[in-house]
């Protein structure tokens, strides 16, 4: 990349850079991101699924003109999937080639087979690649899904941003990654890891912010439709659902309604498109019919003086 890299110079710069990527952020999140960049500290983002935590990392990488490296966490995640592993298939082919040419020697074979040609770099190793001319954005997504043992390894990595591979040596970098860690709080993350990070709780947006998100992402949406969609989603989040719709569902629903040439909400079209907002049959059954009309009526009163349910 030829563009000179530099962190934002102010909180307002953070908001402006993200706005250029169609991501609308409140001041609290902008402050957390600014300090994370300024102090070179990981940022721990916690909140319910669907509030837009992952999108923050994507938008930040685009805004800074750098790479996004994502590590999706899951139960059983270990060093082979997160840091590196050897390409055993290529190593076996190399051994057979050595045997065919008669050039196999135990000492040289061991040295040749364990060099970077056969190394598969996983996200954490990619993030400290020595060839980078600027920090990457490293997203460690849904850490609460991983085992506690992985947290211990991650804590060591965040301490000095270096990884040692016994057969090769130690990898380090002049440009440590910008680290964002997300959690849906399905379990508590160890305090030792949290202490190393800055922390920010990400809420569902209130009416005004979500309306701004919709109109920014979908500038061709009819104003009345955007207002009604936002108000209906805000009311829906106050209903006892198994899975509350997130911001991405709001955008998807508005997009679908535009594809249906809707300029305003009607009970029938809401019922026809419930599957875009809700992903469980129990939730759809709960909302279908008369509840739709009630939610639609209440949503007309939504506006800047009322807020959606905080997560």
Go through each PLM region and give its residues:
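C-terminal regulatory/interaction module of P-loop NTP-utilizing enzymes
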Residues: 1-311
